[in-house]
């Protein structure tokens, strides 16, 4: 078993710890994460950007305050926010550090990271540490899902079902036919679109797979043209919530629809397993993905 697969398997336990951390009335999450009504920007790079998108959609749709998500390198200069939240596993990503330095003394900032005493502790005003979810793998799995569990729990979501679903996602067989598929299109709605994007990235990173991701209502506006025999359209959501007629449209292409009907975050665990399995089937090493390092540190 690869180190990546070992870390994938620990996710439900990490989620339990994140929920407990979010519930601490005097803990770092309560003290440092956005308060109701604050106008917030959430930033990150790679996986962290997609988790930022999911959190931003959840926070704003839940009535907690206007929330935007940006890649750290693309946050608009001069836009007013009450707080900026930076998601960074290693705390060393160049673009995140540069942004936090620019904001220092102007906008309150909070970093969510896995590494104590990392460089991000300097320019960030506050920090939430998830060291129990840190990873040695290059590819993020458990840290990304754990930070989103923390953020969701801080918003007041009841996530008691999630660890059970996570264990099921680890134990159940992969959907039939997916290991043989040549292409994957991941679909989500609302916050699950960020999860769809992260799923597509995991498959590219680990297995070099051809993957795409779209908001589900955009799928008919062109992307459905790549679906066909031997290709998968993967819906992160309740099968009953799939837009009317879309399952029939996918069937007419000859493609396979996967709709697992669980919380999108536990659905992402299934994709983690698929990515690692597909990498092995293709003779690739998920612990050593091509052209990637644990953190992007620019000279």
How would you describe each model-predicted region?
Residues 1, 50, 54-55, 198, ...:
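Conserved phosphate/anionic-ligand binding catalytic regions in large, soluble enzymes, centered on
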Residues 6-37, 126-234, 241-242, 283-299:
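Active-site phosphate/pyrophosphate-binding segments
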Residues 7, 238-242, 262-270:
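Short amphipathic alpha-helical interaction segments
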Residues 34-164, 170-171, 189, 233-261, ...:
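Glycine-rich phosphate-binding loops that contact phosphosugars or nucleotide phosphates
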Residues 71, 210-218, 256-264:
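A generic structural motif
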Residues 124, 248-299:
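Phosphate-moiety recognition in structured ligand-binding domains
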